[in-house]
Amino acid sequence: MLEKLAEAHPVWKEEEFGDKDAEDYIISYSMYNGSWLVWEKDGMPVAVSYHLEWSPSNGKPWLGTVLIDPAEEKKGHAKMIIEQISKLLRAKHKAMFAGVPIERREWILFLSQCGFEQLKTEKDEKGKSFMILVKPLAEAAV
């Protein structure tokens, strides 16, 4: 499923896979003990997500990725997935983080529309800049 979705999203594939294939990519994340989830609609897979409940960078949960089948894009699946992951984490955590390459403005905009707020920029060990975003998980008082 991940390989199929990666092929359908070449920008994401280039950014995330680099020169790896899907299997090597998943293996590279195995040390983080995160959760890969396949999301279905009417019994058919339409999306894949990855999140960590605890990241070594700050001890907090992080959203790694959400990939949607192109035939199912713009139907609210990604927002629903982010909300479901938020609900899973809400009992134990107050916020969830995400890191996006700074030049991927459309990804930053989308996460902002899903309740993430821009927190800061950071550079990785290779000097690449990332926007770090945070999404409050506590339910708003009514």
Curated annotation (Swiss-Prot):
Protein name (Swiss-Prot/TrEMBL): Uncharacterized protein YkzC
InterPro entries linked: Acyl_CoA_acyltransferase, GNAT_dom
PROSITE patterns: GNAT
N-acetyltransferase domain mapped to chain residues: 1-138
Gene: ykzC
GO molecular function terms listed in the Swiss-Prot or TrEMBL record: acyltransferase activity, transferring groups other than amino-acyl groups
Gene3D superfamilies: 3.40.630.30
Organism: Bacillus subtilis (strain 168)
